[in-house]
């Protein structure tokens, strides 16, 4: 479909058009000159540009990472040395070798999940061979000797 042609009889006369332009020039609406910004600082800081949110077409990792420190990964094995046996008998305390990355709260939760016992507190130390030892003090309503029997330490 071709554009509609303008009717030659409706063309405005040149005098009216010139008067219209003269009026616009006189008011100054056509000649707006942008003023130059005066720089007072020596260093030039690049202006901040628009940063769009990331919208990836596909995830960059194939599968979400699994939790490597579950209760089985935290508690490696119970310690059965003579001093550990003395702790079981005298202080109501179980001694475990635990993962180096495990903290006291995770150790406490792991013992609760594995053996269904409440712990009073957990003390940890890192041995010279680089492993972490945890002293798990049980609450008075649990006997460490019975728990050690159930676990199979004794």
From Swiss-Prot:
Cellular component GO terms held in the UniProt record: cytosolic large ribosomal subunit
Organism: Nicotiana tabacum
GO molecular-function term, one example from the UniProt record: structural constituent of ribosome
Region called Disordered, residue ranges: 1-39
Physiological role: This protein binds to a specific region on the 26S rRNA.
Name of encoding gene: RPL23A
Low complexity: bias regions: 15-26
Similarity annotation: Belongs to the universal ribosomal protein uL23 family.
Name by which UniProt lists this protein: Large ribosomal subunit protein uL23
Keyword Cytoplasm among record annotations: no
Keywords recorded for this protein, A-Z: Ribonucleoprotein, Ribosomal protein, RNA-binding, rRNA-binding
SUPFAM superfamilies: Ribosomal proteins S24e, L23 and L15e
Presence of keyword Ribonucleoprotein: yes
Gene3D superfamilies: 3.30.70.330
PANTHER family documented for this protein: 60S RIBOSOMAL PROTEIN L23A
One biological process term in Gene Ontology: translation
